[in-house]
Amino acid sequence: MKTVIRTVCALLGALAFCGNAVLAQAVSPATFEPLLAGAQRSPGNVARDPYRHPAQTLAFFGILDNSTVVEILPGSGGYYMEILAPWLKDKGLYIAANRDGSQPQYLADHQKLLQRLKDEPALYGKVVVTEFRADHHPIAPPGSADVVISFRNLHNWMDQNELEPSLKAFYLALKPGGVLGIVDHRGRTDQTQAEQTASGYVRQDVAIALIEQAGFKLDATSEVNANPKDTKDYAQGVWTLPPSYRMKEVDREKYRAIGESDRFTLRFVKQ
């Protein structure tokens, strides 16, 4: 792992790493449109664009082509990796902080990610992979990242008591003024968080409070990933909806019509 961190430091040096991030610079969603249309994207990921709004989301987080970006748990699917790695490969740095081979349940997916990077060096040859697990979070050298992003992970960390060490790792990795971007399934306000954690939903007010307790400051919110059709009252929780369809063929068309979950999109800064 020390070798990986030294490699990241060397890359940051080549990028003229400075000590402070520029807070959420204005970026147009149109900036990312050519990347969304690129041949590097898998059809399955493209099909999810109407629900995930990648151009608007990345613009909201203020990601520039010279940013150092850490994505938490991209997995082998690499939805955002397919967009960000080509975007950052010349001037910036994309770091994939992934569950590693030390955890058997994640080994196969992690190996798929590594193989994918190896098979497509023109796109992913500069991607750096670091470790992210419950007891060990060396995701990037301290104070090196402009942006840390996480998509639909918060509910798992809350359920598995991993939230506090995860947020500490993000804070340590970010430069002063760096951005933490969080997207997750938005919970109901008429239920406590305890009543809905197991269903995969997180109350937005609870998420904000917990993240601010870790030293971050809420900078802005966005409704770009909102879905008012999501009633949040399903037998199999949020996984009832696409893309999981945990109920399989039961009422599949009903859930397809609802679409993917209602999600909050939050931008925090390291103070």
What are these regions (language model features)?
Residues 85-86, 163-176:
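A short glycine-rich, Lys/Arg-flanked "PGG" loop and its adjoining helix->strand segment in the class I
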Residues 231-271:
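Core SAM-dependent methyltransferase catalytic element
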Residues 108-136:
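S-adenosyl-L-methionine
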Residues 65-76:
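Conserved class I S-adenosyl-L-methionine
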Residues 193-219:
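Conserved Class I S-adenosyl-L-methionine
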Residues 95, 177-185:
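Conserved beta-strand signature within the Rossmann-like core of class I S-adenosyl-L-methionine
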Residues 32-60, 64:
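Class I SAM-dependent methyltransferase Rossmann-like catalytic core
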